[in-house]
Structures are given as C-alpha cells and as structure tokens.
C-alpha cells in the first residue's frame, strides 16, 4: 500500500477526535433474524475459540483423551461434560471434540445428523448463556458472529454457532510473522465495521482481543464471544470490570465510567499486535481473579509509563476516577498528543501507526468512534 498519508502525518497526529462523548441515539435492537448458513472450514477448531476465559492461553482436549480431572467442575454454573454431551445428543448432535470450558459453559465441536458441516455448541445454564444468546439472536452483521440456533433443555441453554478455522491469535502464532499492512487493514476494517454496527445498537463488546476475532480468511473475519457484552449503553456509565486486563482501556482499568470507546482502545491493541508481531505493548497477564484485580492498577501504571502519558491527555473531569487516582503518575517528558516513543522500537507502517495512535488515545473523549475511523483514507481505499 502506498504511503499517501505520509505528508499529512504531522497534521493527523495533532488532530484529535471531537471531545464529546456522544453516541448514536438508535431505536431498540432489530427483530430476530433468521438463521444463516455461513461458509464453514473443515479444519478443527483452535484451542482459544469460543471460550469466555479472559486470562492466559487456553487448551482443548480431545474427547478420547480427556483426563479425569477435566470432568470435575469448578463452577456449578458449568454443566458436567457428560450432561453437556447428553444435551447435545438430545438435539441430534454428535460431539467430535471438546474444547476447554469457558466461564459460562461447555464448548464442543459437533456435527448434526445429515449435516456434514461442523458447528460449535456452547452449553451452559439458562440464566447466563441465554442472555448471550438473546443478544446474538438480535444482531445481524457479516462482521459479527451469527448464531445459528438456540436450544433449551430444562435449565440448560445450548447455543449453536458457526465453526471457524481459527482465531486471530492462533492465526498470528501459526504465521509467526507480522501481517502485511494491506491485509491487516482489511482485517481491522471488518472489526471496525462490526463495532460500528454493535455500537449503533447500543451494545459494547468489552472483550475485543485477538482470541475473540474469528477468521476463515483475511476477508472473512468476525467478532465473537459476547459473554462480557453490555446492553444498552449510550452515555458513559459505571459498568464495572469486564474483559481482559491486557486489552482493557484505561477508563475500564480505573473503574471509571465508560462507553463504546473502550472497545476502540481494545481494537487498537489488536491492530498493533497484527502489525508488530511478536511484540506486544503490555504483557504479564494475571493468572487468578485476585491477581486480575491487583493487575488492573499495575496495568494502568504500565500504560501511563510505556506511552509516557502527558497530564494534558487525561480526562477533563477532575472527579473522574482515572484523574483522581492516576494523574500523579503522568509525565511531562512527552508533549501531549504526539507520537508514542515506544512505537519507534517496532517500526510500524505509517498508516498503521497513525491508526493505533488514534485508537490508543488515553482520554476516551479524544478517541475516534468506529464510524470516524472508517472514514479515514486508508480504509476508503480498500
């Protein structure tokens, strides 16, 4: 891709999004949409697919080789493996692989009698899984995972989801190299189109990360795993901790009020990881819930230190928890809204660096919306 934007880099880095925290005022979610039949890949599901677990790498176990310890449930909300298989069988599905359970249910790759294409079953207690199912039932966009069916057996809900060949994390790991800028922009555009749609429906995902981006090919990508999603959200609100520490926005880590702009930060991290692989901006994920809470503080300090956040880049509201708790850690060694010095070590493509810089604006009010980002020249050319 040509560097047509190079001449405007100075202006772009000095220009910020409208500081208002406005969001689209939209009608309620559209009526339920019919089931769709997207193209499937015959490859086995990767280990990070379709799971709600937010910290650490996930592993899947083959049905025939699962250890006895896998049968034990750490959470009463997760049906036993035998119960999940019984439910799947009662609906005519044959389980061909069991994935590591998520925080809200069992996840299995299965086929239905007479239908050779594999699907993924997410089986959990009605109260939790059904909420996610109801949300997915009412969304319809090619860049958002399409739920094929919702099945209920007593107190258990079974979501039927399309099977993708990989998630973006596994895709990057297998490629073991940076994704070329033209391909990365095609992927990022689809992610932003999905977020634009969700945000217009007043839904925020709250856990956008490479593990939750499913991919069959560069031009067939979707946002998945809505276990942490929140609806309806219009104005910034106290929504609590959710998602993954390493990709959470500063306002989420500080437990301040936030809205859809939190997803933009996370999508910026995804773009950085595509363009800078294997480099990451922020590492050391927590391994326990206790560490998760503690690491929110350390992660926020790491963001301020790594990006050398200037005090002028904090929210204007002095009562914000982000301001009250963290402005004292800000630095004056970098002028506000200028290039983050840490980008120099990874040598990002100029278009990619500009986008990441905009999406990682520390103050959510200065962060562009998905709609604004999609209007940028590098996406208009695709």
From Swiss-Prot:
Protein kinase domain ranges (all copies): 93-379
Binding of ATP, residues: 99-107, 122
Protein name: Serine/threonine-protein kinase
EC numbers for this chain: 2.7.11.1
Keywords for the protein's UniProt record, in alphabetical order: ATP-binding, Kinase, Nucleotide-binding, Serine/threonine-protein kinase, Transferase
Family of the protein in this entry: Belongs to the protein kinase superfamily. Ser/Thr protein kinase family.
Entry-linked Gene3D superfamilies: Phosphorylase Kinase, domain 1, Transferase(Phosphotransferase) domain 1
GO molecular function: ATP binding; protein serine kinase activity; protein serine/threonine kinase activity
Signal sequence residues: none
Active site per database record: 207 (proton acceptor)
Gene name of the encoded protein: US2
Reaction(s) catalysed by this chain's protein: L-seryl-[protein] + ATP = O-phospho-L-seryl-[protein] + ADP + H(+); L-threonyl-[protein] + ATP = O-phospho-L-threonyl-[protein] + ADP + H(+)
Acidic residues compositional bias, start-end: 45-75
Skewed-composition ranges (Basic and acidic residues): 1-10
PANTHER family assigned: SERINE/THREONINE-PROTEIN KINASE NEK, SERINE_THREONINE-PROTEIN KINASE NEK11
Annotated region (Disordered), positions in chain: 1-75
Pfam families: Pkinase (PF00069)
Superkingdom assignment: Viruses
């Amino acid at each position: 891709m040509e560097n047509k934007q190079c001449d405007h880099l100075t202006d772009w880095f000095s220009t910020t999004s409208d500081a208002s925290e406005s969001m689209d005022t939209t009608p309620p979610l559209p009526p339920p949409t019919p089931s769709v039949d997207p193209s499937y890949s015959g490859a086995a599901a990767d280990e990070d697919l379709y799971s709600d677990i937010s910290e650490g790498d996930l592993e899947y176990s083959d049905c025939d080789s699962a250890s006895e310890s896998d049968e034990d449930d750490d959470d009463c909300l997760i049906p036993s493996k035998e119960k999940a298989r019984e439910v799947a069988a009662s609906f005519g599905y044959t389980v061909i692989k069991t994935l590591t359970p998520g925080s809200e249910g069992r996840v299995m790759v299965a086929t239905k009698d007479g239908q050779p294409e594999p699907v993924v079953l997410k089986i959990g207690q009605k109260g939790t899984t059904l909420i996610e199912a109801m949300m997915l039932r009412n969304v319809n966009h090619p860049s958002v995972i399409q739920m094929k069916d919702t099945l209920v057996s007593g107190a258990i809900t079974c979501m039927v989801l399309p099977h993708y060949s990989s998630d973006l994390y596994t895709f990057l790991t297998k490629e073991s190299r940076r994704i070329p800028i033209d391909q990365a922009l095609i992927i990022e555009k689809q992610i932003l189109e999905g977020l634009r749609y969700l945000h217009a429906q007043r839904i925020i995902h709250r856990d956008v990360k490479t593990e939750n981006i499913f991919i069959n090919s560069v031009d067939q990508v979707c946002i998945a795993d809505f276990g942490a999603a929140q609806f309806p959200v219009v104005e910034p609100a106290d929504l609590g901790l959710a998602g993954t520490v390493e990709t959470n926005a500063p306002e989420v880590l500080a437990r301040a009020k936030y809205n859809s702009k939190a997803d933009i930060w996370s999508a910026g991290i995804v773009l950085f990881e595509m363009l800078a692989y294997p480099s990451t901006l922020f590492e050391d994920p927590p391994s326990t819930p206790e560490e998760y809470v503690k690491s929110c503080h350390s992660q926020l300090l790491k963001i301020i230190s790594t990006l050398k956040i200037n005090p002028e880049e904090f929210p204007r509201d002095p009562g914000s928890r982000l301001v009250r708790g963290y402005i004292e850690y800000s630095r004056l060694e970098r002028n506000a809204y200028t290039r983050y010095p840490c980008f120099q070590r990874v040598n990002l493509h100029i278009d990619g660096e500009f986008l990441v810089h905009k999406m990682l604006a520390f103050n959510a009010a200065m962060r562009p919306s998905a709609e604004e980002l999609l209007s940028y020249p590098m996406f208009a050319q695709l």
